[in-house]
Structures are given as structure tokens and as C-alpha cells.
Amino acid sequence: MNEYDKMLRRLYLATNRIDGGYYFFARGAEVKENVLALLYALDDGQPHTQAEIARDWQIPKTTVNTNIKELKAAGYVAFLSSRAGREKALVLTEAGRAYARRVQRGMYEAERTALERTLERFSPEFVDAMDYFADCVCEELSRRAPQKGDK
């Protein structure tokens, strides 16, 4: 295995470990992993459409829709009708913000501590590098992905 392949494998495994960490955190918090991501997406205080959340957080639209229905029934999200277009934007209600804080408190603390520990060893530029790498990987995979029906 050449050096690039070794580095790519380490990056792939690192991102999978991070995903796994969130998965196990969600299980411990007794929420679905995609609900945790949805709360994270909405916790920035800005309105978002279901399509935006599906695209930005890489969650299937049907899963976003199902989770939104559950959160709406629990009183945690509300739809806004003031945005242009036919799709309504979502926001957390006051109860939803309290629920998100309760579910995510330990997660945010863990993330901050992990970032602080990382910044003790590495430059903050690692975030830009990781973001750029993610953009490049997605772009290259998109260019090379087989189309449906290709064999």
C-alpha cells in the first residue's frame, strides 16, 4: 500500500470513528442518530427547509420528513410560512430548544473538549484542510460515480 493509500485509509477510518461516536452518543441519549443530526441542524437558531437539511446533513428526504413529523407531534418544531417558495422553513420551538439542549449538552461539551485538545497539537487550519478535503472527495466521487443503469 503506498503512502497516499495509507493516508486515505486513516482519514476514512477517522471519519467513521467520528460518525460512530455520534451514533453511540445518540443511542445513549435515547434518540435516533438522524434526530440528533436534525436537532444539530436546527440548533443554530436559523430557519431551514427539509430539503436544505437533507442536502447539507446528507440525510434522506424521507427520513428528514419522518423525523420532522415526530418532532412536530412532540411540539419541538414549528413551520414558518414566510419564506418564498412552497416549502416551509422549520425552527425549533421553545420546548424544542430545551429538548435539544438537554439531548446535546454532553455532545457539545465533548466536541469543545476534543477541539481544545486537538488545537493544543495542531493548527486551526486543520479544520479548513478537512473541509477542503471533504469538498474535493465529494466532487471527485460525484464526477466518477456510476450512473444508474451503468454496469
Language-model-detected regions and their locations in the chain:
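C-terminal regulatory/oligomerization modules of transcriptional regulators
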Residues: 1, 121-151
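Alpha-helical initiation/capping and key positions within long helical/coiled-coil segments
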Residues: 3-6, 10, 56, 63, ...
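Generic structural signal for well-ordered, non-transmembrane alpha-helical segments
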Residues: 9-16, 94-98, 124, 131, ...
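DNA-binding alpha-helical recognition surfaces that contact promoter or target DNA
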Residues: 66
